[in-house]
């Protein structure tokens, strides 16, 4: 019997259970390494209801929240700029995170309460309904969260915004947005050990003006270039 996962004790990898440093490779590489198989990126086979979304007209799904603050896109006007642009181009924007829109604390992490979106946030929506909304969307835009992985698995064109992890960490089949500022601090997930109890975790620059600069320095124009490419907007 094989035990498959990321095994570590404190800040030390348990070498007799996992033969390599999983932080230096794509997350998907862990199972084949432990099982002695050739690594290749594989999407899971998902069974999705044939039911159609109840959203009329063409739309884009966004999922700006995540389980760690370090995963957020921290540009203060980033998400609203993307929403306004998509609305201007005739696309509805659907927000699908569990974290509720209109909650002051959660909204503060996004630069304020986002406007111009169809609100499908909340923890009372079934995963099957999330999958339908993602499947029928023209595009998904998210951060390093489970919903981005779900979109990729479903096959919806996906934009993933992250500076917390290096681009090789997640999956190749997406538009991966990473800061163009070569001086910015990046990739703490791959270099350090996350403290899940510290919401403001930023191991190199917490409580300084450089706090979360890995995504503060990702400009909306970078994301819009990927949006235009995937939606064929010229």
Where are these regions (language model features)?
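Catalytic machinery of carbohydrate-active enzymes
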Residues: 1-234
């Amino acid at each position: 019997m094989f035990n498959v996962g990321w095994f570590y004790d404190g800040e030390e990898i348990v070498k007799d259970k996992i033969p390599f440093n999983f932080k230096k490779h794509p997350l998907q590489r862990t199972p084949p390494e432990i099982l002695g198989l050739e690594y290749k990126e594989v999407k899971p086979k998902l069974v999705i209801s044939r039911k159609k979304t109840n959203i009329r007209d063409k739309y884009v799904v966004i999922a700006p929240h995540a389980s760690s603050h370090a995963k957020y896109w921290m540009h203060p006007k980033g998400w609203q700029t993307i929403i306004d642009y998509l609305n201007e181009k005739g696309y509805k924007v659907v927000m699908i995170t569990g974290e509720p829109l209109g909650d002051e604390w959660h909204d503060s992490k996004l630069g304020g309460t986002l406007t111009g979106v169809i609100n499908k946030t909340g923890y009372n929506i079934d995963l099957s309904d999330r999958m339908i909304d993602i499947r029928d969307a023209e595009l998904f835009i998210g951060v390093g969260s489970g919903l981005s992985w779900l979109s990729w698995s479903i096959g919806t064109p996906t934009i993933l915004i992250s500076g917390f992890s290096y681009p090789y960490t997640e999956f190749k089949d997406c538009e991966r947005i990473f800061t163009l500022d070569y001086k910015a601090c990046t990739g703490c997930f791959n270099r350090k050990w996350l403290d899940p109890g510290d919401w403001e975790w930023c191991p190199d620059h917490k409580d300084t003006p450089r706090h979360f600069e890995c995504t503060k320095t990702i400009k909306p124009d970078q994301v819009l270039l990927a949006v235009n490419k995937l939606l064929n907007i010229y």
